[in-house]
Structures are given as structure tokens and as C-alpha cells.
């Protein structure tokens, strides 16, 4: 479960980075 949660968290962070990049652009 911990590993799965970590993977989901990593994906969420990546999505946030993409959203920030779109806002900056």
C-alpha cells in the first residue's frame, strides 16, 4: 500500500508540474 501511495503521489506531483508549466506558458 505504501508503495502504491508513493507512486500516486509522484504522479500527482508530475501533474501539478505540468499544470504549472501550462499556466507559466
From Swiss-Prot:
Residues spanning the signal sequence: none
What ranges does the record give for the region Disordered, renumbered to this chain? 1-25
Q: Where is the composition biased (Basic and acidic residues)?
A: 1-10
Official protein name in the record:
Unknown protein 4
- Polar residues bias locations: 16-25
Amino acid at each position: 500500500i505504501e508503495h502504491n501511495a508513493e507512486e500516486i503521489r509522484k504522479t500527482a506531483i508530475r501533474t501539478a508540474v505540468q499544470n504549472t508549466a501550462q499556466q507559466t506558458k
